[in-house]
């Protein structure tokens, strides 16, 4: 008699963020959380297609308000967070970002059933290296992005949440037109694939502990 091993139950996944999570200008299948789930399954990690709460242009405060409005009562096996570029773009302070990011981390952990080890944060891409930023002070943008990312990283360390630094990958995309969508600002599937590849081993470690 052949024994059939039942499939492992899917691990629910919630992705929180802004244009970089929704994949502005790219196909839905190219969104980095969707690619992460697709990469995880053949590795024996049955990650479900993600629920996504994200919109182009959102700051930390706007994401938090949208989460409240969504009134999502589910608990997830994995929650991702990538947010902050619009805080920097609008000239908001790092101190305000830190405060609001800390609150979002708490929200993400709540969605993960209070388990910090089921939350992963991705760093803010450096839009100063995009075609959209031509004529702007790229060095100043890079400095500010680094400051925002340092604040996020420190908050993750305090909360014992995993932090994945994808910013170098976005900087390396400079000058490669195939890495950007038609608006010259957002990223195509190949760039977001790199984020998913970089995040996969972190998620594997977290969910197999």
Where are these regions (language model features)?
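Serine-esterase "nucleophile elbow" of acetyl-processing enzymes
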Residues: 1-56, 66-73
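Catalytic His-Asp segment of secreted/periplasmic serine-dependent ester chemistry enzymes
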Residues: 126-209
């Amino acid at each position: 008699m052949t024994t059939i091993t039942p499939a492992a139950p899917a691990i629910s996944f919630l992705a929180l963020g802004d244009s970089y999570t929704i994949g502005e200008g790219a196909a839905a299948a190219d969104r980095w959380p969707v690619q992460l789930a697709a990469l995880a399954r053949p590795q024996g990690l049955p990650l479900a297609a993600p629920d996504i709460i994200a919109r182009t242009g959102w700051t930390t405060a706007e994401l938090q308000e949208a989460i409240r409005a969504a009134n999502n009562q589910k608990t997830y096996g994995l929650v991702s967070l990538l947010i902050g570029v619009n805080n920097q773009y609008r000239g908001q302070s790092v101190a305000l970002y830190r405060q609001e990011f800390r609150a979002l981390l708490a929200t993400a952990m709540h969605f993960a059933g209070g388990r910090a080890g089921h939350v992963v944060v991705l760093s803010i891409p450096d839009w100063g290296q995009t075609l959209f930023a031509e004529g702007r002070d790229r060095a100043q943008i890079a400095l500010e992005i680094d400051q925002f990312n340092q604040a996020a990283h420190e908050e993750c360390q305090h909360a014992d949440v995993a932090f994945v630094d994808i910013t170098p990958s976005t900087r390396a995309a400079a000058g490669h037109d195939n890495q950007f969508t038609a608006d010259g600002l957002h990223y195509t599937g190949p760039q977001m694939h790199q984020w998913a590849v970089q995040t996969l081993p972190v998620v594997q470690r977290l969910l197999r502990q």
